[in-house]
């Protein structure tokens, strides 16, 4: 069940160039959130009407807190980067579905860029039931590696080769001989497309979380659809609403 509430910022810090980590005290959202879901964050600036979708990085259900990690890319995130402890933050969530967790299977978690944060909570939820291996892809500057390492083995790929394998997450998987029974992935579309092809070629179940600009965040406006293999019951055409039907899909369900 989704909730709209005025939450409180607990803390915020910069963890890499242009990347911020914020902990939020919520009333109901944290208690119900699972790995793979997101929240919509509303701007204080009245000229910016649409909320910004941000994936959930971590959840502490006992304390009723959640963490978001985001990159500053425009007016909304620039505003948010100025929030300090005690500030109100208007949010809606938890939204979307979560990853379908498979027990008893060796998992490969793959995150690219700002698609890395959801892998922190997913690893926390999976580590007690499966072997967790995380492959994280960066342009150059690393973040969240300490959190990822608490959940299992971590393999790094950087575009410039400054850390780990030089190249893509697929290059790192091959170079480090990472194997598994199921892949969970989040990141830019070209990365997800390559992961889908790799999973298909190696007969591995693959779940992908799609990143897309959103408007309503609840499936009403059809502003964030993607092409799907089957017809959508809502529109009777071959598409899926990323905010409502996703953001997590089985890779074979959607076209990238």
Language-model features, listed with the residues they occupy:
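Short, basic/aromatic-enriched C-terminal tail that caps enzymatic domains
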Residues: 1-3, 239-256
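N-terminal [4Fe-4S]-dependent radical SAM core
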Residues: 47-49, 200, 253
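Ferredoxin-reductase
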Residues: 2-85
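FNR/FR-type flavoprotein reductase catalytic core
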Residues: 75-213
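Local cysteine-cluster metal-coordination motifs and their immediate loop/turn environment
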Residues: 118, 212-247
């Amino acid at each position: 069940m989704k909730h709209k509430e005025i939450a409180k910022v607990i803390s915020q810090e910069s963890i890499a160039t242009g990347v911020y980590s914020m902990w939020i005290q919520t009333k109901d959202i944290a208690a119900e959130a699972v790995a793979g879901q997101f929240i919509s964050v509303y701007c204080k600036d009245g000229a910016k009407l649409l909320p910004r979708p941000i994936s959930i990085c971590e959840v502490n259900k006992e304390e009723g807190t959640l963490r978001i990690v985001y990159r500053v890319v425009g007016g909304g995130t620039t505003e948010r980067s100025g929030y300090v402890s005690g500030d109100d933050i208007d949010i809606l969530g938890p939204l979307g579905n979560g990853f379908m967790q498979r027990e008893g299977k060796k998992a490969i978690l793959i995150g690219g860029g700002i698609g890395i944060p959801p892998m922190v909570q997913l690893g926390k939820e999976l580590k007690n039931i499966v072997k967790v291996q995380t492959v994280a892809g960066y342009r150059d500057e690393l973040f969240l590696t300490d959190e990822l390492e608490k959940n299992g083995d971590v393999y790094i790929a950087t575009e410039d080769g400054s850390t780990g394998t030089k190249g893509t997450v697929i290059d790192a998987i091959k170079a480090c001989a990472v194997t598994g029974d199921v892949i969970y992935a989040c990141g830019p579309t070209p990365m997800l497309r390559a992961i889908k092809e790799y999973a298909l070629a190696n007969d591995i179940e693959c779940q992908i979380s799609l990143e897309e600009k959103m408007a309503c965040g609840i499936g009403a406006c059809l502003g964030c659809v993607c092409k799907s293999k089957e017809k959508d019951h809502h529109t009777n055409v071959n598409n899926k609403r990323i905010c409502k039907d996703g953001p997590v899909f089985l890779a074979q369900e959607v076209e990238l």
